[in-house]
Amino acid sequence: PGPCCKDKCECAEGGCKTGCKCTSCRCAPCEKCTSGCKCPSKDECAKTCSKPCSCCXX
């Protein structure tokens, strides 16, 4: 794994932190998902969202 990515990915808005390489970076749980992000609940968003760190609104 690349830098910053051992147990969990360190995220920044829109993707991984600068210099970090990871394939499993996901956004944190949120109130609701933005359109185009498929998830049944806010808790599932971080697990199933395909747009790292930018799928959640609010």
UniProtKB/Swiss-Prot annotation:
Domain of life according to the entry: Eukaryota
Sites where the protein binds a divalent metal cation 1: C4, C5, C16, C20
GO molecular function: metal ion binding
Residues involved in a divalent metal cation 2 binding: C5, C9, C22, C25
Binding site for a divalent metal cation 4: C30, C33, C49, C53
SUPFAM superfamilies, per database record: Metallothionein
InterPro entries membership: Metalthion_crustacean (IPR002045), Metalthion_dom_sf (IPR017854)
Cysteines joined through disulfide linkages: none
Residues bound to a divalent metal cation 5: C33, C37, C55, C56
Sequence intervals crossing the membrane: none
Keywords, alphabetical: Cadmium, Copper, Metal-binding, Metal-thiolate cluster
Organism of provenance: Homarus americanus
Protein name: Metallothionein-1
Region Beta: start-end pairs: 1-28
Residues that bind a divalent metal cation 3: C11, C16, C25, C27
Function: Metallothioneins have a high content of cysteine residues that bind various heavy metals. The different forms of lobster metallothioneins may have different biological functions. Class I MTS in marine crustacea are involved in the sequestration of elevated levels of heavy-metal ions. Binds 6 metal ions. Known to bind cadmium.
Region spans: Alpha: 29-58
Entry's family note: Belongs to the metallothionein superfamily. Type 3 family.
Binding residue positions for a divalent metal cation 6: C39, C45, C49, C56
